[in-house]
């Protein structure tokens, strides 16, 4: 891959975006299977159809954001890149978890390990995602005020 060494670290964003786009594609086919009423898909996703749709759309949105930050070619600190890549997955996976485990729809009534860990996972995901994309947005915005190099 030919890339300016100054932006090489941002390749993580490109890799994550491609992976999460593939996840969205797989979920799109799962939505087709669910809509056709194929029993195997309903067995895998016993939760609400809308949760699979939300996961699909969120993976698409997160992929688009990651592709956009990569395309901006603004160097980002490693911790921001990783927070964006991880947060893009965890944020989308919250909907997927609810589709796979319907008991998570009402965590206050649910019991067990999944019900106990879900609120912690949710808050960690929101914090990581907010930090990554928030800091990334501030970094890109600040870069627009820097003097352009002379040509």
What are these regions (language model features)?
Residues 23, 27-29, 49-72, 86-96:
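Core segments of alpha-helical transmembrane spans in multipass integral membrane proteins
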Residues 76-93, 148-151:
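Cytoplasmic juxtamembrane regions at transmembrane-helix boundaries
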Residues 9-34:
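N-terminal signal-anchor transmembrane alpha helix
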Residues 30-45:
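Membrane-interface helix-loop junction between the first two transmembrane segments
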Residues 59-69, 124-137:
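Hydrophobic cores of alpha-helical transmembrane segments in multi-pass inner/ER membrane proteins
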Residues 1-9:
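Short, Lys/Arg-rich, polar N-terminal cytosolic tail immediately upstream
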Residues 45-58, 112-123:
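Short aromatic-rich membrane-water interface segments that cap or initiate transmembrane helices
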Residues 94-110:
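Transmembrane alpha-helical segments of integral membrane proteins
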């Amino acid at each position: 891959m030919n890339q300016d060494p100054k932006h090489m670290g941002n390749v993580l964003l490109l890799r994550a975006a491609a992976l999460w786009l593939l996840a969205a594609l797989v979920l799109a086919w799962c939505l087709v299977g669910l809509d056709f009423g194929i029993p195997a898909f309903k067995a895998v996703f016993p939760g609400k159809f809308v949760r699979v749709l939300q996961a699909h759309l969120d993976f698409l949105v997160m992929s688009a954001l990651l592709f956009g930050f990569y395309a901006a070619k603004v160097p980002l600190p490693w911790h921001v890149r990783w927070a964006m890549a991880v947060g893009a997955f965890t944020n989308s996976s919250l909907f997927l978890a609810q589709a796979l485990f319907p008991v998570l729809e009402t965590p206050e009534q649910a019991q067990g390990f999944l019900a106990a860990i879900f609120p912690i996972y949710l808050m960690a995901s929101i914090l990581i995602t907010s930090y990554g994309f928030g800091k990334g947005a501030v970094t890109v915005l600040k870069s627009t005020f820097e003097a352009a190099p002379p040509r």
